[in-house]
Structures are given as structure tokens and as C-alpha cells.
A protein has these predicted regions:
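Small-residue-rich segments within alpha-helical transmembrane domains of MFS-like 12-TM solute carriers
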Residues: 28, 32, 98, 114-122
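Juxtamembrane helix-start elements in MFS-like secondary transporters
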Residues: 48-56
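Conserved MFS/SLC helix-loop-helix module at the cytosolic interface between two early adjacent transmembrane helices
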Residues: 65-104
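Helix-breaking motifs and short loop linkers at transmembrane-helix boundaries and internal kinks
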Residues: 46, 78, 99-105, 116, ...
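Residue-level signature of mid-helix packing/kink "hotspots" within the transmembrane helices
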Residues: 32, 60-68, 118
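Helical-face signature of the major facilitator-like transporter fold
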Residues: 20-28, 60, 94, 102-106, ...
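Extracytoplasmic
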Residues: 15-49
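Cytoplasmic helix-loop-helix junction between adjacent transmembrane helices
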Residues: 109-141
Length: 144
């Protein structure tokens, strides 16, 4: 007995591009929240400018190092699975950040957040390469 053929979704690549755009937008918005909240966080937690800078650096270091790690992982496990792991990771860490009660825990959560969010760029780039024909790849990347 044969299985019924699934009907292809018209322009599926553009739906995937939209999901990648949303993920990237969430990443960029999330990165900016710390800057917007800095005056309030510094006051509530009694952080100095140096403390705040160290927290921002923790995110950036993890983000920079994580892209290489995620790139290799995504190549190994596949784009869909790799991006799902990354999005799940940074979503959970975003929620857990609310449990931070001081400098050390906040810096640790921001480090973990940077590590999770760093999956987005290698994963989104690979997804565009997989789903978009060569003639549309750059417009696909422009939306990511």
C-alpha cells in the first residue's frame, strides 16, 4: 500500500525565511534589552559601570566562541535539529535569567544566553543555503 503524497507548501522557503527572520529579530531585540535596562539594573543591583561592562562582555565572549561550536554542531546534527536546540536553549536561559540575584548569577545567565543565541547566525545561514535557490539566496540572507 502506498502512502499518500504530501502536498507541497507553496513558497515554503519564504515561510522558513520568515521564521528565521523572527528568530534573528528576537536575538537582536534581546541583545538590546540589557542596554535599555542598564540604569535600572545598575541601581537595583548596585553595579558599577565596570560590573555592567563585565556582564555585557560575558555575553559577547560566549556569542563569539559559540558560533564556531554551533556551526560544527549544526553541520553534524542538521539545521532543523541544531536550530531547535539553540532556540530552546536561549528561550530557557531567558526565563532563567529572571532568577538572577546578583552580579555572578546575572553574568552567568548572560554568558549562557550568548552561547545559545550564537546558534542563530550559522544555523540561519545554512538554512538559507539549503532552502533557497542560488538566484534567491542573497535576498533570503538579507531577510535573516
Amino acid at each position: 500500500m502506498s502512502r499518500p503524497q504530501a502536498r507541497p507548501i507553496p513558497a515554503l522557503r519564504w515561510w522558513i525565511g520568515g521564521v528565521l527572520f523572527a528568530s534573528t529579530a528576537i536575538n537582536y531585540i534581546d541583545r538590546q534589552t540589557l542596554s535599555i535596562l542598564a540604569p535600572y539594573l545598575k541601581q537595583d543591583y548596585h553595579w558599577t559601570n565596570a560590573d555592567y561592562a563585565d556582564i555585557a562582555i560575558a555575553f559577547r565572549v560566549a556569542y563569539s566562541l559559540g558560533q564556531t561550536v554551533w556551526g560544527r554542531l549544526i553541520d553534524r546534527v542538521g539545521t532543523r535539529r541544531g536550530l531547535t536546540i539553540g532556540v530552546t536553549w536561549y528561550s530557557i536561559v531567558s526565563v532563567l535569567t529572571s532568577l538572577a540575584n546578583g552580579f555572578t548569577s546575572f553574568a552567568a545567565f548572560r554568558f549562557l544566553l550568548g552561547a545559545g543565541e550564537s546558534a542563530n547566525w550559522p544555523g540561519a545561514s545554512k538554512a538559507v543555503s539549503e532552502w533557497f535557490p542560488k538566484r534567491e539566496r542573497e535576498i533570503g540572507r538579507a531577510h535573516v
